[in-house]
Amino acid sequence: MKHSLHTVLTLLFVCASAWGENVPWQNPQINEINREPAHAHFIPYTNEANALKQQALPAAQRFAVNPATERRISLDGTWKFLFSKNNEECPTDFYKMGYNTKRWKDIQVPGSWELQGFDSPIYTDVAYPFPANPPHVPTDYNPVGAYVREFTVPAHWKGMDIFLDFEGVESAFYCWVNGELAGYSEDSRLPAHFNITPFLKAGKNKLAVKVFRYSDGSYLEDQDYWKYSGIERDVYLYARPQSRVQDFKLVAGLTNGYKDGDFNLDITLHKPHLGGIVEVKVMDKGNVIYQHKKEITSATDTLFAQKHLFPAILPWNAETPNLYTLVVSTYDAQGKALESFTQPFGFRSVEMRNGMQLINGVAVLFKGVNRHEHDPHHGRTITVESMIKDIQLMKQFNLNAVRTCHYPNRYEWYALCNEYGLYLVDEANIESHGMQAHKDGTLANNPDWEVPFMQRMSRMVLRDRNITAIVTWSMGNESGYGKHFETLYDWTKKFDPTRPVQYEGGGYDAKSDIYCPMYARVWALRRHVNQRDARPMILCEYAHAMGNSVGNLQDYWDLIYKYDQLQGGFIWDWVDATFDIKDKNGNKIWAYGGDMGFVGVPNDSNFCANGLVAADRSLHPHIWEVKKVYQYIHFDPVAFTTKQIKVTNWHDFIGLEDYKLHWTVETDGKAVQSGEMDFPVMAARSSAFITIPMNLIPNDGKEYFLKLEAFTKKEAPLVPKGHQVAMEQWQLNPEGERLLNATWTARELVDKTVNTERTPDAITLTGENFRIAFSTADGEMTELLYNGKNLIKEGLQPNFWRALTDNDVANNHLERCGIWKFAGKNAKLQSIDLKEDSNKQLATVTVNY
């Protein structure tokens, strides 16, 4: 078998020579060597009891490796590491047995080497960190990391197939076991599995890995994020019996008016054990509600298909994420357990109908956000605890959807979104934004790149297809448009007709089930509805949340609530991609752009800080605006004299029975009236009228406000009891009416008799208790006297400027609008007139700016 593998590798290297480089890492036609075919993610355990025991653990513990109950060993931890400036400087024989690595440094796996003292991370939005000449990457400065560690295979794994699993390595790597080449892989965001059984020996085994910072794959990984390298996700060994489940596909939809569950399961077996048993169970909260066994009667009996109708099930959606548990177990002919695995799933349907994306028959509104995987100390290497924290904040701030920008995430993220309830747009690791400055413009029409395009999309779909929370596939981001995307669309729709497929790059002309532009203006939403496109419009990116931002979010949602075809969008983005470090003076800073030590390399400054939350997940002010706009309970005044309020339930599926309403009348920041009540029975997307039992407020010259708040009645997963989910506030006048147009006029403050005087220097208007004067030289108000006190220090000037925000700077606002900064000071008086109009004295000043 080893001889056969070496023959295959030799042929691949010969094929690669056509590119002028005898290396796969500069050849888009070669993206893997000896890598196992992609399959659905699952973790096998020794038996059903152990699988269910692990599944029952709290989320923060459930994903930890447990050697006592599963045939899996973590290779995370301390490895020996050597950093080289390029491939030529990297030792050519470090993978061989007997090579001495004692003088090498230590490094932690998983983790980017740039964040552990080797080289520096680079932040760019669009530009590649090297001159673009696809598929070639620099050879003079293309850092290479050499990793080495030892491991021991448990004796009881004898006779089983043993696999090496890298969950994510950036950007390309080789791996050797005991001096033998085990394989090669590209695509930094999907796992690479290698069958290393032929290379193993009793006792200690040597594992060596060679990672390239840049490869041809880097041309498809040009996301608006930091550029790192290294082994960034977990590494495992795992063992499986030769007779095993190779893959499975689960489709659990809804039928009969979305009331019954339509269960379809396809299992692919590897080397079926004659006389063995495949057993399938479906469990609901620990109780078996369905069970089926099949005996293997032929060595060619590799397919197992099962269909079943579950009446009156509880459907899954983001508001009520009801999950069932699939348990698949295999047994040998003697009835001995071979292995078992579980897959939590929900019954959920996705349809495209009447220009809308329907979840369980409802045109849900996607109150979404884009989320990069980011940690303020470890970059792309994140923890399960941080994932749970993200979901907790999203749920508490009324978000219900996430786009995995712009690559497949760690598998734990999908399991958690299944459990806690978030809709997911799962995005392939395809972005070649930097090609827009290249003569070719895009790689999507280059036939040499069809293979990596297809592998990146298909492998993501194959891994993630059993995740209920995924309601849309995305083919990538900002890579132009071309025939490769049409090929990806056709393949994905054929393989998985149960979900829509989207891509923003082609605009209205793209093969995309959803029109999903980025940063469309508010008027573009109205245009989409008017032109009657047959697709829903869901913004893949909008409301750029950089600095003081999201100020016009309500403008978008006024239209989204009005038109069914507008179904929301995904804010850019969730978390600032900054680092918690100290500057040269020892002061703590949030580092961005060029702050991380790479001198002389272009960077895009603080454009990586676009989050609703900071890198440590502390809250930015604008997330409160998002919470308000995204809230599910809306209040509208009907008639304050009768104390009536209209309440609208904008949930997609649930009523308001789990919420209570608290009302308060406040003045000068203090409550003077308050009360609490239940909401009336209200189905999703319905309205009702309620009466607030408040007393009329006194006419005492104070400002009074009515504040309405909705709170949770009980604790829910990640959301505490008493959590505020919605609020509204209106100003009241003494008659109890809302001040719809709160204004004041001079007649409220002064006697109705106004005298005027005009001199060469000024125009003056005088009443019983006030005097206002305007300069005839420049038109400025020079005096505002009220009750004997001058209220202004000097002449008032109009100001057409404010402090710039980050978004202003980023879109060249100063260049476009800078002329207005000093317009008030540079004003030239054109005319000043005084006349009486309807018993009112009007002073009109006309100024040119």
Task: Describe the predicted segments one by one.
Residues K201-K204, T268-E351, Y704-L749:
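Extended acidic/polar, glycine-enriched regions
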Residues N22-F63, Q116-D119, T124-V126, E180, ...:
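Extended substrate-binding grooves/exosites of carbohydrate-active enzymes
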Residues V177, D260-I296, Q644-E676, T691, ...:
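Beta-strand-rich binding/interaction modules
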Residues D76-P129, P720, Q724-Q729, A762-N848:
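Acidic-aromatic substrate-binding/catalytic surfaces of carbohydrate-active enzymes
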Residues K293-A312, G669-D700:
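Intrinsically disordered, low-complexity Pro/Gly/Ser/Thr-rich segments with frequent PxxP/GP/PP motifs
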Residues E21-D93, K707, T712, G736-N799:
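Beta-strand-rich N-terminal accessory domains
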Residues Q242-P272, P621-D658, T745-D761:
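Surface beta-strand/loop "capping" patches
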Residues P24-E36, I43-P44, K80-S84, S112-Q116, ...:
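Accessory beta-strand-rich segments of carbohydrate-active enzymes
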